[in-house]
């Protein structure tokens, strides 16, 4: 939106597949995201709607850790910050998926860092270090 003529979603196809397997090859989960803005507008409700930025965090962790992280994380919509946040358990007790929608990169990045700090605190006993000012 800040480039050229303010282009948003000016692409033909976005296809992203995320999957995880156990060391023996057993599939734990698979998520496929496909966007074709010229066939199915991403501004539709249920897709991006009014948001421009999308973040996706996958946490592969044992069920007890996933439950504790899930309990500490709220799903919400903040109309002042223009942020929507969701969290779900992945299938096969393999962890969590955390999603954030926003209108600007900075607030989305902040929410993702807060979540990652919660995860690190739960798993390692230490939060993420503060972000350096020049990043």
Enumerate the predicted regions with their spans.
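A structural signal for small-residue-enriched, beta-sheet-centric alpha/beta enzyme cores
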Residues: 3-135
């Amino acid at each position: 939106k800040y480039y050229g003529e303010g282009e948003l979603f000016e692409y033909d196809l976005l296809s992203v597949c995320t999957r995880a397997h156990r060391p023996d090859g057993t599939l734990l989960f698979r998520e496929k995201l496909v966007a074709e803005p010229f066939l199915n507008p991403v501004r539709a409700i249920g897709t991006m709607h009014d948001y421009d930025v999308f973040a996706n965090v996958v946490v592969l962790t044992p069920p007890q850790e996933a439950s504790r992280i899930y309990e500490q994380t709220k799903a919400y919509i903040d109309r002042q910050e223009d942020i929507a946040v969701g969290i779900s358990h992945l299938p096969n007790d393999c962890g969590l998926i955390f999603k954030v929608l926003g209108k600007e990169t900075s607030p989305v990045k902040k929410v993702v860092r807060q979540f990652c700090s919660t995860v690190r605190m739960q798993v390692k006993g230490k939060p993420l270090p503060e972000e350096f000012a020049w990043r």
